[in-house]
Every structure is written in C-alpha cells, then in structure tokens.
C-alpha cells in the first residue's frame, strides 16, 4: 500500500505538520471510502509547549501522545466536536499534529464543510473510536498527495490557545494559502507568509 510509513510520523511535530499539507487522509469503513486533502495543520511540540495537552503531563487522556508515533489521537472539545491528531516525534515526547481542515476529494457529498477540526471529523466519520488506532491500516491511513510548495504555505498562531501565554503566539499553524477549505483564523493582516 502507498501509505505514509510510521517513520514519517517519528519526526518533530513542526516537520510533520508542514509535510502533511497536501497529503490525503483516508477513512474506509462500512463499505464507504472518504478522502480529504489536508490543507491546514497545527503542531503541538511536547510537554514544554503550554498549548499542548501533554503540558499537563501523562494522564489517561494524553497517554497516547507519549506513545509511539503514527497513531491517532482523537478527543472531544466542548463535549461534542471531535478533533483528529497524529502522534509524532519519539516515544515519550508528547507531541502531535492537529489536522484542522481538509479539502474534500472522494466520498463526500458536494457542499460538505470540512473547514475546522470538528467539521472534518464529522464529514470523514472520525470519532473517539479511532483514538489510539495506528495510521497504517486499511481503515485509517494517510497517503502522499500533491506536494505543496513552500511559496503556497502560510504560518500563524494556533487557534483557541490564548491560555498558553507566549506559546499562543508561536507560528505553529500552517495552511495552504489559497485553499477555500481552511478554518477561520486571524485576520489577513496578522497572518505570516512562509
């Protein structure tokens, strides 16, 4: 199979976040195949990153982040929206990349919104049942897509992490600049080109 190998994920979250842009996120369940091209990510680089769930240490919720790379970390926000992350870096690092938005490619009705982590999870059928699943399986995997040139990538602060002090301003959010599928973010004047 032409899946991204586990070794792809076993690198720093910022590297993986950049290289996931353009990759295909594939979910094949119940006889249905749903595919989205990743157009927006956020890197969470470990325990020292105060915006990262791992900053609070090893808990039942974050245990998956401290495990091997190449595993899904899916959690709920506001008790109703799922967020899909890929665990990155070395075992014990507590790092992950949040997939914030995808462009519909296959298996999604026209007009399906996939801008934002909750919407993309709903569209692709990703739930807590996918938490801790390996990303190199027929059910859930990522494939190489069309590479996104550096000139087409924007970087800026992550969304919704104002509580993280100076970490809130780090440009760890990456997106395909001209994509119509990225989530809402800072106004254009605050966005930093690559």
From Swiss-Prot:
InterPro entries: Formyl_transferase-like_C_sf (IPR011034), MPG (IPR003180), MPG_sf (IPR036995). One of its GO terms (molecular function) is DNA binding. Pfam families: Pur_DNA_glyco. SUPFAM superfamilies: FMT C-terminal domain-like. Its EC number is 3.2.2.-. Keywords: DNA damage, DNA repair, Hydrolase. PANTHER family: DNA-3-METHYLADENINE GLYCOSYLASE. This is Putative 3-methyladenine DNA glycosylase.
């Amino acid at each position: 199979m032409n899946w991204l190998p586990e070794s792809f994920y076993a690198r720093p979250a910022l590297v993986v976040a950049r290289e996931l842009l353009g990759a295909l996120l594939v979910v094949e369940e119940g006889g249905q195949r749903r595919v989205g091209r990743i157009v927006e990510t956020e890197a969470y680089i470990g325990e020292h990153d105060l915006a990262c769930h791992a900053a609070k240490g090893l808990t039942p919720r974050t245990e998956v982040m401290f495990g091997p790379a190449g595993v899904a970390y899916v959690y709920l926000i506001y008790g109703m929206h799922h967020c899909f992350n890929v665990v990155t870096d070395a075992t014990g690092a507590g790092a992950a990349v949040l997939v914030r938005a995808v462009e519909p490619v296959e298996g999604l009705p026209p007009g399906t919104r996939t801008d934002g982590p909750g919407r993309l999870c709903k569209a692709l059928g990703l739930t807590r049942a996918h938490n801790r699943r390996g990303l190199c399986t027929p059910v859930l995997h990522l494939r190489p897509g069309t590479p996104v040139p550096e000139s087409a990538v924007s970087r800026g602060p992550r969304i919704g992490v104002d509580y993280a002090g100076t970490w809130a301003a780090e440009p760890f959010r990456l997106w395909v600049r001209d994509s119509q599928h990225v989530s809402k973010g800072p106004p254009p004047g605050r966005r930093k080109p690559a």
